[in-house]
Amino acid sequence: MATVIPGDLSEVRDTQKAPSGKRKRGESKPRKNFPCQLCDKAFNSVEKLKVHSFSHTGERPYKCTHQDCTKAFVSKYKLQRHMATHSPEKTHKCNYCEKMFHRKDHLKNHLHTHDPNKETFKCEECGKSYNTKLGFKRHLALHAATSGDLTCKVCLQNFESTGVLLEHLKSHAGKSSGGVKEKKHQCEHCERRFYTRKDVRRHMVVHTGRKDFLCQYCAQRFGRKDHLTRHMKKSHNQELLKVKTEPVDFLDPFTCNMSVPIKDELLPVMSLPSSELLSKPFTNTLQLNLYNTPFQSMQSSGSAHQMITTLPLGMTCPIDMDAVHPSHHLAFKCPFSSTSYAISIPEKEQPLKGEIESYLMELQGGAPSSSQDSPASSSKLGLEPQSGSPDDGAGDLSLSKSSISISDPLSTPALDFSQLFNFIPLNGPPYNPLSVGSLGMSYSQEEAHSSVSQLPTQTQDLQDPANTVGLSSLHSLSAAFTSSLSSSTTLPRFHQAFQ
């Protein structure tokens, strides 16, 4: 039985309507001047009162026009919101279980199932729980109606019979009270009938036996998606509640661009704390890779090349040149190292090589006279511009201005000639004058011990923060010494420093 509201709502004057638009900060909420004649509720507009009146009359003027859908609504907004459920596209996704929804409010209601601190409403009579207060109130109204109470627990309206009250409760549940649904759609393989075509398609798995829905936790298969969902909630509830907390792996840009293998000798040094790294004199570290392998020609294509980089504290690290992009091979004419350069000598420089070998043979017989000659000899070590002719091929090995400016502070009385020979391998093989592809050098074991004994003191001076000269300056000086050996005009000057 529908109850008619006394008075016609269309007769309400337009001047009594609440002003539309957003309220300003200082304004108060609009007064609810439009009370309902059947209940105690009041509204601030005629439209809202009219929509509310449909809950008493059971009228639903806005009907869905989709095929096989008999739903109707009290407002145009609710009809438009419902029409989104007929769309095949689901735009709202749950971040916990990746379930998709047509409407945002459906997703919001679904998120309550993942909230560990969610507020649930539990019925004391049957123990059923509800996430929303409205659903809980509808459930309590059903209990009250079956017990004989003729008052609606949702809107507090009284009815004359239990049947009328139950029919009224459907309006609060969003269901139409007019007409009885018919099962219009029949299965082709059996006599069962269903309300919608979707129910028929879901029923078809009984006849086909297909099980397309696989459980990702136990590999059990199901023919219907709702059966899989029920299985997941029942058997794998803990796995569903776990949130994916694994961060995205951000790759190191250095390791992405170049794969640099570090030698085993550097691993104990790199594992030291930073305080010990700055205070400890690296007597052994300076000797790392001093005599790696016999120097090979950069023109040899069959062998793997190695490039030795100089770390900030004077440590050297070999880099496999095959791991670098091939375009980088053009940028390095000779490998960077604390030792002498691996130089491919052209044919026109072969006479110069004989002079270098004869000089090195004379160098083995004698030792530096004293450390007093170091300032004078350091000025003759090729720190002056080379006077070689451009036809000598020494242009590729000429000393740059930057290396000259760095090596100038090293011309101090505290500098010994033994420091200039830190590029000579201490424990290398004996000098072989017949070796063609290398510039190997050697000297007596006594000179090696004297050089090693003097290395720690000089290393501590170089590690001093007040000293502006780093170990890289020694490397550049070694390069200057090597480049000075390549010119025939500077060899006699360097030889006179030891006489």
UniProtKB/Swiss-Prot annotation:
Region (Interaction with KPNA2): 2-84
Motif stretch (Nuclear localization signal): 22-25
Tissue: Expressed in heart, spleen, lung, kidney, brain, testis and epididymis but not in salivary glands.
Region (Repression domain): 243-383
Low complexity: compositionally biased ranges: 365-379
Cellular component aspect of the GO annotation: centrosome; cytosol; nuclear speck
Primary role: Transcription factor whose activation results in up-regulation of target genes, such as IGFII, leading to uncontrolled cell proliferation: when overexpressed in cultured cells, higher proliferation rate and transformation are observed. Other target genes such as CRLF1, CRABP2, CRIP2, PIGF are strongly induced in cells with PLAG1 induction. Proto-oncogene whose ectopic expression can trigger the development of pleomorphic adenomas of the salivary gland and lipoblastomas. Cooperates with CBFB-MYH11.
Note: Mice overexpressing Plag1 develop normally with high Plag1 transgene expression in salivary glands, spleen and weak mammary gland detection. They develop salivary gland tumors with major pathological features of human pleimorphic adenomas at the age of 1-5 months.
Entry text on domains: C2H2-type zinc fingers 3 interacts with DNA-binding site G-clusterinc fingers. C2H2-type zinc fingers 6 and 7 interact with DNA-binding site core sequence.
Protein name: Zinc finger protein PLAG1
Native species: Mus musculus
Underlying gene: Plag1
